[in-house]
Amino acid sequence: MATMIIRHKVEVYAKWKRGYDEADWLRKQHGITYASVHREESNPNDIIVVHQFRDMKGAKDFVNAAPPIMGEIGVIGSPEIWFSEDVEQVTYS
């Protein structure tokens, strides 16, 4: 598995979130198996998204396919993106 963490600023969180939700088809198309959305504590328009993929190819293909949609839903500037290979995952209750 692979994880991608992306951080970017948006014009208005509510507009971005609607567009993000409507692009569910794109996430499914590229094999995203898990997603979580986070906001910077002091700036709700500073977004961090975590996506897990079946493999690194899906993650990189997704990043290449997403830019047109990102502009439409209000992403400002270039995002910061990190890729990682999943080594271990533990759930605590």
Residue positions per predicted region:
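Short structural boundary motif marking the start of a folded domain
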Residues: 1-4
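An amphipathic, aromatic/His-enriched active-site/gating alpha helix that lines ligand/cofactor pockets
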Residues: 17-36, 52-85
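Short, low-order "capping/linker" segments at domain edges
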Residues: 85-93
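Short, surface-exposed ligand-recognition loops at beta-strand->loop->(often short) alpha-helix junctions
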Residues: 9-19
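Short hydrophobic/aromatic beta-strand micro-patches
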Residues: 7-9, 50-52
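A short beta-turn/loop motif at secondary-structure boundaries
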Residues: 38-43
